[in-house]
Amino acid sequence: MCSSEECLIDKSWTSEEKCEYIKCNQDSCEGGGYLTWSHYVKCQYNIGVRVILIILGILYLIILFVIMSSIADDFFCPAISGIVSHLRMSESIAGVTFLAFGNGAPDVFSSISSVLTTPKPKADLALGDLFGTSIFVTTVVLAIIIFTKSFKVAIIPTLRDLIFYMTTLAFIVFCFLKFDKIEVWMPATFLGIYGVYVVTVIILGIYRTHRKKRNLKKKNKELEDFLSRPSSAASTTPIFGAMKLKEETISVSALFHFMIGYSQFIKNLTRANLKRTTNNNNNDNKNEKRGIVNLGFSEPYSIPSERKISTIFKQNTFETDLESLESLADLDGSDDEGREEKFGYAHHTVFTSHDQISLVASEIEEIEITTWRSWDWVWDLFNHLKSWPSRDEFSEMNIFIKIVTVIKVVPVFFFKLTVPSNEMSWCKPLFILHCFASIQFALFSIQIITLKPFDGSPGLWLYGLGFSAILAMVAMYFLPLSKEQKYYKEIYSYLGFLMSIAWIYATSNEIVSVVTMIGVVTGLSMELLGLTIMAWSNCIGDIVADIAVVKQGYPKMAMAAAIGGPLFNLLIGFGLPFTIAAAQGKEMELLINPVYRLLMLFLGISLVTTFVALFIQRFTVRRPHAVLLIFIFVVFLIFICLAEFHVLEWN
């Protein structure tokens, strides 16, 4: 009965026998978290209490998904953005490495947790989650994006991602058909495919940059020729008729963006406007999110046609160098990949990079602290640890966001207590708390807090406490109370990255534990639970973010995330944990059961459908394409249910 590779409970067993089986096979019947839900439920012989435990487990699962979403969006992604900024990585490299890792963190860590936390890896749960997420995103999420707005796709990036995706799927099918267990070279090949993908992105990015610079040099010369015309001609030429270069008019919106971005005068006005918006939110911007100022002006500005170009040039000084023109071309949107704007994702709302700065600035009130004797430092610490919105902000939320916000109050408090954030201002008391809380939670998250390095030794928690005390004393003596340190943001980016991983990893273990309990109680397979509960819950944030991105005018970015995101999750989520597990000597079977056949079949159908539809529609996605994707997903669900209940047998 013990050492079973799968948690298979016979319905004819008594309750005591089922409980003993769970205790004897915790590696296969539990998920690796601190709470052993299968044991709690199956070893409870009172039916009423058992039902209550199951309900509590489901509620706990919902809270865990909220925690996962919050830590990934509000702490992990900003930390990654800070690291990318510090390393000065190009957008193409950052987009397929750090930023993709940030977006796919829940899926990747769920896979790592289900594979590495037990001696007998749950490969079926990991693959079910990855495949289920892939199908859901490439059908439902992509369809929602298209329903929101029809648009012309970025041709080269979209085709690149689809080709790599279909190649990866073909390799998975090959492995399932030819082998019955996972060898170390199989997941390593996935990591190799990801390496080739990154190199391809870099090469295409270099080519695109070279092409853009060549075109911009040409436009630079033409613009200089235009500006060198006699001032009398320029002063009487309306802006809508004068800026014609090679029969291609530069939009007024792009020109206005250009002058705003490179005029110190306008920058100063923007800072003043930002300050006014933060402090006087209850006036004209009462219905907008407090502290948010869109410095990019997503809507085109209209300038009266009678305004003369010479007047504008006199009011705003700027240089017409190559770098400035590069920004002008990006804003004009003529590039195949569309406008390139760095995005932050916080509180289920997508903001541009400068918007997010405003958001953070509005959340924490600045307090000047001069001495420990005053109690200002207590109020400053309270503001930094505050995890609930103001009354005005809460009243403006809809009912769903209010519920999520209430759920997040306690978790966010512990996030702020243990995760250094590069978005918050310097707070020395909070740094000292981080010295203790962060180290203890890091040990707790990987379940070694009570581990004894040798016989007679105290647990690692005591060693961590001693190390924390040393750090705290150094901070007390050397760090100033109010002045922000030079590399504070950079250091907090890396520390926040590590602590966010600790939270995501611990949360993933608990999620797997609850999902495993549901499988034990209902008798449903791990594949079905992975491709439904785990996959769909991880996609809720994607839907919210992608719709927001589309509504802000960036549908190409949303579509790139809908295709490139699951590709990254599949390559890294399968390649990394299974490579480590195989290197450790763990045996993992490759069972091509009907569920896996359907997963691979319908994922291939969805990818091929999108690939062919792009050519048929001449790379402009429309609603019939979205309807077809929804139909594919509905048919997939029907077949999965038939296969799960053995109505459909695929031999």
Curated annotation (Swiss-Prot):
<feature type="transmembrane region" description="Helical">
    <location>
        <begin position="92"/>
        <end position="112"/>
    </location>
</feature>
<dbReference type="Pfam" id="PF01699">
    <property type="entry name" value="Na_Ca_ex"/>
</dbReference>
<feature type="transmembrane region" description="Helical">
    <location>
        <begin position="459"/>
        <end position="479"/>
    </location>
</feature>
<comment type="similarity">
    <text>Belongs to the Ca(2+):cation antiporter (CaCA) (TC 2.A.19) family. SLC24A subfamily.</text>
</comment>
<feature type="topological domain" description="Extracellular">
    <location>
        <begin position="420"/>
        <end position="428"/>
    </location>
</feature>
<dbReference type="GO" id="GO:1905815">
    <property type="term" value="P:regulation of dorsal/ventral axon guidance"/>
</dbReference>
<feature type="transmembrane region" description="Helical">
    <location>
        <begin position="627"/>
        <end position="647"/>
    </location>
</feature>
<feature type="topological domain" description="Extracellular">
    <location>
        <begin position="480"/>
        <end position="486"/>
    </location>
</feature>
<keyword id="KW-0106">Calcium</keyword>
<dbReference type="InterPro" id="IPR004837">
    <property type="entry name" value="NaCa_Exmemb"/>
</dbReference>
<feature type="transmembrane region" description="Helical">
    <location>
        <begin position="429"/>
        <end position="449"/>
    </location>
</feature>
<protein>
    <recommendedName>
        <fullName>Mitochondrial sodium/calcium exchanger protein</fullName>
    </recommendedName>
</protein>
<keyword id="KW-0739">Sodium transport</keyword>
<dbReference type="InterPro" id="IPR051359">
    <property type="entry name" value="CaCA_antiporter"/>
</dbReference>
<dbReference type="GO" id="GO:0099093">
    <property type="term" value="P:calcium export from the mitochondrion"/>
</dbReference>
<feature type="transmembrane region" description="Helical">
    <location>
        <begin position="399"/>
        <end position="419"/>
    </location>
</feature>
<feature type="transmembrane region" description="Helical">
    <location>
        <begin position="127"/>
        <end position="147"/>
    </location>
</feature>
<dbReference type="GO" id="GO:0016020">
    <property type="term" value="C:membrane"/>
</dbReference>
<keyword id="KW-0109">Calcium transport</keyword>
<keyword id="KW-0496">Mitochondrion</keyword>
<keyword id="KW-0812">Transmembrane</keyword>
<dbReference type="GO" id="GO:0006812">
    <property type="term" value="P:monoatomic cation transport"/>
</dbReference>
<keyword id="KW-0050">Antiport</keyword>
<keyword id="KW-0813">Transport</keyword>
<dbReference type="GO" id="GO:0005743">
    <property type="term" value="C:mitochondrial inner membrane"/>
</dbReference>
<keyword id="KW-0406">Ion transport</keyword>
<keyword id="KW-0999">Mitochondrion inner membrane</keyword>
<dbReference type="GO" id="GO:0006874">
    <property type="term" value="P:intracellular calcium ion homeostasis"/>
</dbReference>
<feature type="transmembrane region" description="Helical">
    <location>
        <begin position="511"/>
        <end position="531"/>
    </location>
</feature>
<feature type="transmembrane region" description="Helical">
    <location>
        <begin position="51"/>
        <end position="71"/>
    </location>
</feature>
<feature type="transmembrane region" description="Helical">
    <location>
        <begin position="162"/>
        <end position="182"/>
    </location>
</feature>
<feature type="transmembrane region" description="Helical">
    <location>
        <begin position="560"/>
        <end position="580"/>
    </location>
</feature>
<keyword id="KW-0732">Signal</keyword>
<feature type="transmembrane region" description="Helical">
    <location>
        <begin position="487"/>
        <end position="507"/>
    </location>
</feature>
<dbReference type="GO" id="GO:0005739">
    <property type="term" value="C:mitochondrion"/>
</dbReference>
<comment type="function">
    <text>Mitochondrial sodium/calcium antiporter that mediates sodium-dependent calcium efflux from mitochondrion, thereby acting as a key regulator of mitochondrion calcium homeostasis. Required for patterning of neural circuits: functions in the same pathway as RAC-dependent effectors of the unc-6/netrin signaling pathway to set left/ right patterning of the VD/DD GABAergic circuit.</text>
</comment>
<feature type="topological domain" description="Extracellular">
    <location>
        <begin position="113"/>
        <end position="126"/>
    </location>
</feature>
<keyword id="KW-0716">Sensory transduction</keyword>
<feature type="topological domain" description="Cytoplasmic">
    <location>
        <begin position="205"/>
        <end position="398"/>
    </location>
</feature>
<feature type="transmembrane region" description="Helical">
    <location>
        <begin position="184"/>
        <end position="204"/>
    </location>
</feature>
<feature type="topological domain" description="Cytoplasmic">
    <location>
        <begin position="648"/>
        <end position="651"/>
    </location>
</feature>
<dbReference type="GO" id="GO:0005432">
    <property type="term" value="F:calcium:sodium antiporter activity"/>
</dbReference>
